[in-house]
Amino acid sequence: MAGHSKWANIKHKKAAQDAKRGKIFTRLIKEITVAARLGGGDPNSNPRLRLAVDKAYEQNMPKENVERAIKRGSGDLEGVNYEEIRYEGYGIAGAAVLVDCMTDNRVRTVADVRHAFTKYGGNLGTDGSVGFLFKHCGQLLFAPGTDEDKLMEVALEAGAEDIIAHDDGSIEVITAPYEFVAVKEALEKAGFKAELAEVTMKPVNETELTGDDSVKMQKLLDALESIDDVQEVYTTAVID
């Protein structure tokens, strides 16, 4: 893993997310709605919903918006019925890309995703073409200077799978998806606040890009992110 660039990449990702706050609200509302539809409207018994609600509040989403989305999902209010779809493909220099979507029109979505891949030098693959290059897991990243020994003790006790100390001083905690909330809460209770905390698709191996390849890959990722139906974009690319 490229430890030296981990922290810079996370800070870049956070800045990009902050710049797209309006779109983040839309995505979170979709996620809350679908999570409530699939697992019920009680966050205490629905880990996926709990995670989505926590993220919404971290983004300062008004409580009434959150509650309305839960009611739409659980059937108490009328709403759009979204379908979850994952597309797989390749970007620049063979970097793998996963694109998670929620849509009410599959034909529109696949056309938009294919157009972005084609326009910016990638290509849309078939189901299963790159999914095996990622691991579904919880990920928490802590700033350089964090007490590694204490964090490791708390994280492992709470059920974390792995702790990675990066070259830049940041510390990464990996969990099984279903253990993520418990580990996050245990660490917060012990005074550890993650700079990034999410259930994600983590690359098994990373593809480091530099120069023109970095610029081209970023354009592809930005194009995919800008599609209304896209919820998340994951890639093995590390952009210098």
UniProtKB/Swiss-Prot annotation:
Gene3D superfamilies the record matches:
1.10.10.200, 3.30.70.980
The source's superkingdom equals: Bacteria
One GO CC annotation? cytosol
Give UniProt keywords alphabetically.
Cytoplasm, DNA-binding, Transcription, Transcription regulation
Q: Does the keyword Transmembrane helix apply?
A: no
Q: Where in the cell is it found?
A: Cytoplasm
Cytoplasm as UniProt keyword = yes
UniProt-listed GO biological process terms: regulation of DNA-templated transcription
List the molecular function annotations (GO) for this entry: DNA binding
**Where is it chiefly localized?**
cytoplasm
Which family does the similarity line name? Belongs to the TACO1 family.
Q: What is this protein called?
A: Probable transcriptional regulatory protein Nmul_A2722
Protein source organism: Nitrosospira multiformis (strain ATCC 25196 / NCIMB 11849 / C 71)
